[in-house]
């Protein structure tokens, strides 16, 4: 458990080590997406509700009305006070004073922080030990209605709750006999301020019906109305609903738990913190404790990661400074972005105006002459006094005649003329005997046409004699590489 003491560093510069640790806490809160919050009486001290033990506290106010009563502060929240009429009367007066103070209480920075987490969809659930119901002033839904859980699906009704009151609701009255719930009214408030408990109207109606019908009245009692809160040593009337709801939240696997304004001394709250811490650490989350008093390091070192010793509201104000976007609504964020875009656009469109140079009068120059000089020549005036200017050389630019040339067209593929096929002369070795005989056969009809008709009639001996020299000639020509087509 890392301890960060902000009370010792108030008004002074924060040490580097403390600043680094605090930055880790702030960074984790800003990145968390599914948070659970546990609150105690410490977050309501700045709401206008008097504390219990100071000179103007509620205990002294009650003693002023009941000077003979000897009741300790802890006894006002114990179930044993119902055994004594004097203790019960003190209890009624104390609760009426606390109820009146809660009506005039204003939400603190811590209450508003819980509301912001809800609006940003970062809040899974807020569990509170407080019974003052200040959260309802900022439109956070709280209070367990038994009829709603009986008539509808459990998970649907449970997920509609923003704040779960672990120790009851001061703004409701419940019957000690039938457990029916009632709202406060002027009659009930007057009776309780005087130390008297109002009677339950439902129990009274049931009693009268049995009385008028002539039925037995044995065991029929009329209950008394008292604030719907859980006292020490008393069984919680909504324990089944709370247990089922807490198990549902554990299955949702939150990634952060912030504990604010409680000393963690109640057994049930200790068990809740340890169960949530185990689930959160398995997911890689962190548990952050914020209160004015320190915890026992040996008891909580395995469950709490960061301990911030500070006033709860001061811690929230510091978060506002470090992560301001978390505390802005979506409309405010959108308008801020539009303003930034507008400022950037105006700065881009704004013309750049150069400042006019002032003419400085050098010694030896009259004021009238100085006025004739333009601001652009301010620098040249100084140069003329001390530095000789080089003569300006005019360079003539030769005129260059440019010939107009036709715009080149994209080249086309040139036409390649077909080359005549060259006859390849065969060597004598390449000519076979079959080619020689085939050529001889083709020449025979040509020789027949050239010969006279008489010779063809006279006989074939002369033809054979004539064919023989022709064959020889062809064979000789073939050896030399000469074909008949070339003749």
Swiss-Prot record:
<dbReference type="GO" id="GO:0004407">
    <property type="term" value="F:histone deacetylase activity"/>
</dbReference>
<dbReference type="Pfam" id="PF02146">
    <property type="entry name" value="SIR2"/>
</dbReference>
<dbReference type="GO" id="GO:0036166">
    <property type="term" value="P:phenotypic switching"/>
</dbReference>
<dbReference type="GO" id="GO:1900429">
    <property type="term" value="P:negative regulation of filamentous growth of a population of unicellular organisms"/>
</dbReference>
<dbReference type="GO" id="GO:0070403">
    <property type="term" value="F:NAD+ binding"/>
</dbReference>
<dbReference type="GO" id="GO:0017136">
    <property type="term" value="F:histone deacetylase activity, NAD-dependent"/>
</dbReference>
<keyword id="KW-0862">Zinc</keyword>
<feature type="binding site">
    <location>
        <position position="175"/>
    </location>
    <ligand>
        <name>Zn(2+)</name>
    </ligand>
</feature>
<feature type="compositionally biased region" description="Basic and acidic residues">
    <location>
        <begin position="397"/>
        <end position="406"/>
    </location>
</feature>
<dbReference type="InterPro" id="IPR003000">
    <property type="entry name" value="Sirtuin"/>
</dbReference>
<dbReference type="GO" id="GO:0000183">
    <property type="term" value="P:rDNA heterochromatin formation"/>
</dbReference>
<feature type="binding site">
    <location>
        <begin position="261"/>
        <end position="263"/>
    </location>
    <ligand>
        <name>NAD(+)</name>
    </ligand>
</feature>
<dbReference type="GO" id="GO:0005634">
    <property type="term" value="C:nucleus"/>
</dbReference>
<feature type="compositionally biased region" description="Basic residues">
    <location>
        <begin position="415"/>
        <end position="425"/>
    </location>
</feature>
<feature type="binding site">
    <location>
        <begin position="40"/>
        <end position="59"/>
    </location>
    <ligand>
        <name>NAD(+)</name>
    </ligand>
</feature>
<keyword id="KW-0520">NAD</keyword>
<keyword id="KW-0539">Nucleus</keyword>
<keyword id="KW-0808">Transferase</keyword>
<feature type="domain" description="Deacetylase sirtuin-type">
    <location>
        <begin position="15"/>
        <end position="336"/>
    </location>
</feature>
<dbReference type="GO" id="GO:0046872">
    <property type="term" value="F:metal ion binding"/>
</dbReference>
<dbReference type="GO" id="GO:1900239">
    <property type="term" value="P:regulation of phenotypic switching"/>
</dbReference>
<keyword id="KW-0805">Transcription regulation</keyword>
<feature type="binding site">
    <location>
        <position position="312"/>
    </location>
    <ligand>
        <name>NAD(+)</name>
    </ligand>
</feature>
<feature type="binding site">
    <location>
        <begin position="129"/>
        <end position="132"/>
    </location>
    <ligand>
        <name>NAD(+)</name>
    </ligand>
</feature>
<feature type="binding site">
    <location>
        <position position="178"/>
    </location>
    <ligand>
        <name>Zn(2+)</name>
    </ligand>
</feature>
<protein>
    <recommendedName>
        <fullName>NAD-dependent histone deacetylase HST3</fullName>
        <ecNumber>2.3.1.286</ecNumber>
    </recommendedName>
</protein>
<dbReference type="InterPro" id="IPR026591">
    <property type="entry name" value="Sirtuin_cat_small_dom_sf"/>
</dbReference>
<keyword id="KW-0479">Metal-binding</keyword>
<keyword id="KW-0804">Transcription</keyword>
<feature type="binding site">
    <location>
        <position position="200"/>
    </location>
    <ligand>
        <name>Zn(2+)</name>
    </ligand>
</feature>
<comment type="function">
    <text>NAD-dependent histone deacetylase, which could function in telomeric silencing, cell cycle progression and chromosome stability.</text>
</comment>
<dbReference type="GO" id="GO:0044182">
    <property type="term" value="P:filamentous growth of a population of unicellular organisms"/>
</dbReference>
<dbReference type="InterPro" id="IPR026590">
    <property type="entry name" value="Ssirtuin_cat_dom"/>
</dbReference>
<dbReference type="InterPro" id="IPR029035">
    <property type="entry name" value="DHS-like_NAD/FAD-binding_dom"/>
</dbReference>
<feature type="binding site">
    <location>
        <begin position="291"/>
        <end position="293"/>
    </location>
    <ligand>
        <name>NAD(+)</name>
    </ligand>
</feature>
<feature type="compositionally biased region" description="Polar residues">
    <location>
        <begin position="448"/>
        <end position="459"/>
    </location>
</feature>
<feature type="binding site">
    <location>
        <position position="203"/>
    </location>
    <ligand>
        <name>Zn(2+)</name>
    </ligand>
</feature>
<comment type="similarity">
    <text>Belongs to the sirtuin family. Class I subfamily.</text>
</comment>
<dbReference type="GO" id="GO:0005737">
    <property type="term" value="C:cytoplasm"/>
</dbReference>
<dbReference type="InterPro" id="IPR050134">
    <property type="entry name" value="NAD-dep_sirtuin_deacylases"/>
</dbReference>
<dbReference type="GO" id="GO:0030447">
    <property type="term" value="P:filamentous growth"/>
</dbReference>
<feature type="active site" description="Proton acceptor">
    <location>
        <position position="167"/>
    </location>
</feature>
């Amino acid at each position: 458990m890392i301890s960060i003491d902000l009370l010792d560093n108030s008004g002074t510069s924060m040490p580097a080590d403390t600043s680094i640790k605090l930055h880790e806490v702030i960074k984790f809160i800003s990145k968390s997406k599914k948070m659970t919050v546990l609150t105690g009486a410490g977050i309501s001290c700045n709401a206008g509700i008097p504390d219990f033990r100071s000179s103007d506290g509620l205990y002294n106010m009650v003693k002023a009305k009941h000077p003979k009563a000897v009741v300790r502060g802890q006894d006002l929240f114990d179930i044993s006070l119902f055994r004594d009429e004097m203790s019960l009367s003190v209890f009624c007066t104390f609760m009426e004073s606390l109820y009146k103070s809660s009506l005039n209480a204003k939400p603190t920075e811590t209450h508003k922080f819980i509301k912001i987490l809800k609006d940003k969809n970062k809040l899974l659930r807020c569990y509170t030990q407080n019974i003052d119901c200040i959260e309802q002033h900022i439109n956070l839904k709280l209070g367990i209605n038994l009829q709603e859980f009986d008539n509808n699906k459990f998970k649907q009704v449970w997920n509609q709750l923003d704040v779960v009151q672990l120790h009851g609701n001061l703004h409701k009255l419940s019957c000690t006999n039938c457990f029916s719930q009632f709202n406060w009214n002027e009659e009930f408030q007057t009776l309780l301020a005087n130390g008297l408990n109002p009677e339950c109207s439902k129990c009274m109606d049931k009693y009268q019906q049995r009385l008028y019908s002539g039925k037995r009245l044995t065991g029929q009692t009329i209950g008394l109305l008292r604030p719907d809160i859980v006292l020490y040593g008393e069984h919680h009337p909504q324990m089944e609903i709370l247990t089922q709801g807490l198990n549902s939240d554990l299955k949702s696997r939150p990634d952060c738990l912030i504990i604010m304004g409680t000393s963690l001394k109640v057994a049930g709250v200790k068990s809740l913190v340890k169960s949530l811490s185990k689930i959160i650490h398995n997911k890689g989350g962190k548990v952050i404790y914020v209160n004015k008093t320190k915890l026992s390091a040996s008891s909580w070192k395995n469950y709490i990661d960061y301990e911030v010793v500070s006033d709860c509201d001061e811690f929230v104000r510091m978060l506002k400074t470090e992560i301001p976007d978390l505390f802005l609504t979506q409309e405010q964020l959108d308008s801020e972005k539009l303003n930034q875009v507008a400022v950037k656009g105006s700065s881009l469109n704004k013309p750049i105006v150069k400042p006019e140079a002032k003419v400085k009068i050098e010694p030896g120059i009259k004021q009238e002459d100085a006025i004739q000089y333009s601001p652009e020549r301010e620098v040249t005036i100084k140069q003329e006094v001390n530095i000789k200017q080089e003569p300006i050389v005019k360079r003539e630019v030769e005129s260059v005649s440019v010939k107009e040339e036709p715009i080149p067209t994209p080249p086309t593929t040139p036409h390649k003329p077909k080359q005549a096929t060259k006859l390849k002369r065969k060597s004598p070795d390449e000519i076979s005997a079959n080619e020689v005989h085939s050529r001889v056969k083709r020449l025979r009809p040509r020789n027949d046409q050239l010969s006279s008709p008489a010779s063809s009639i006279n006989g074939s001996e002369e033809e054979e004699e004539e064919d023989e020299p022709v064959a020889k000639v062809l064979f000789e020509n073939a050896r030399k590489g000469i074909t008949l087509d070339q003749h």
